[in-house]
Amino acid sequence: VIPFVASVAAEMMQHVYCAASRRC
């Protein structure tokens, strides 16, 4: 498992959630 990929995926998911909920 590559930690970098996991980190990028986690950040992307959080960004999507932030944009969707509009609570940035």
Curated annotation (Swiss-Prot):
GO terms for biological process: defense response to bacterium. It comes from the Eukaryota. It is found in: Secreted. Antimicrobial peptide. InterPro entries: Antimicrobial_frog_1. This is Brevinin-1Ra. Disulfide bonds join 18-24. The lineage of its organism: Eukaryota, Metazoa, Chordata, Craniata, Vertebrata. Keywords: Amphibian defense peptide, Antibiotic, Antimicrobial, Disulfide bond, Secreted. It holds the Pfam family Antimicrobial_1. Expressed by the skin glands. Its main location: secreted. Belongs to the frog skin active peptide (FSAP) family. Brevinin subfamily. One of its GO terms (cellular component) is extracellular region.
